[in-house]
Amino acid sequence: MIKINIGLKGSGKTPKLIEGVNSAIDIEKGNVVCITEGNRLMHDITQKARMINTEHFDIKNIDVFEGLLCGIIAQDFDVTHIFIDSIFKSVPNATMEDLEGFIERLEKLEDEFNVSFTIMVSAEESTAGEKVKKYIG
């Protein structure tokens, strides 16, 4: 499953992310990962989730970010859900067009490794392409 929550700053994406991660810990049979820029959510998200702060990595583009995801999955085949908070903060040079291609590659990871992805996108929904709109929920 791929799910995208899209909206401008202040539209409630972060509370949905926190609730989603904390709920997934109780529901998922495997490990849950939350990727965010900074440590601001570490007190809101259960310690049972693996938190990854992208500030520790030099993420220049969406391809490097995809490499990070592949590394997470390769290191732990028990990962069943990856939550990504504010992808454009973790990948500041990324565009909505980049996100379209990224979603296509996530579909392959989802199918091959049975990993679900929930992505928070700070943007107006009207700027999303068809591939992104398919997963808005």
Labelled PLM ranges:
Residues M1-I4, L17, E100-F102, G137:
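Gram-positive cell-envelope targeting signals
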